[in-house]
């Protein structure tokens, strides 16, 4: 998931 935890995942 993109931006799920502000890591760009």
Swiss-Prot record:
Record has Cell membrane as a keyword: no
Keyword Metal-binding: no
Residues carrying Leucine amide: 9
Subcellular location field: Secreted
Gene Ontology BP term (one): neuropeptide signaling pathway
Keywords: Amidation, Neuropeptide, Secreted
Main subcellular location: secreted
Domain of life: Eukaryota
GO annotations of cellular component type: extracellular region
Function noted in UniProt: May act as a neurotransmitter or neuromodulator.
Family to which this protein belongs: Belongs to the allatostatin family.
Protein name: Carcinustatin-11
Species this chain originates from: Carcinus maenas
């Amino acid at each position: 998931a993109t931006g799920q935890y502000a890591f760009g995942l």
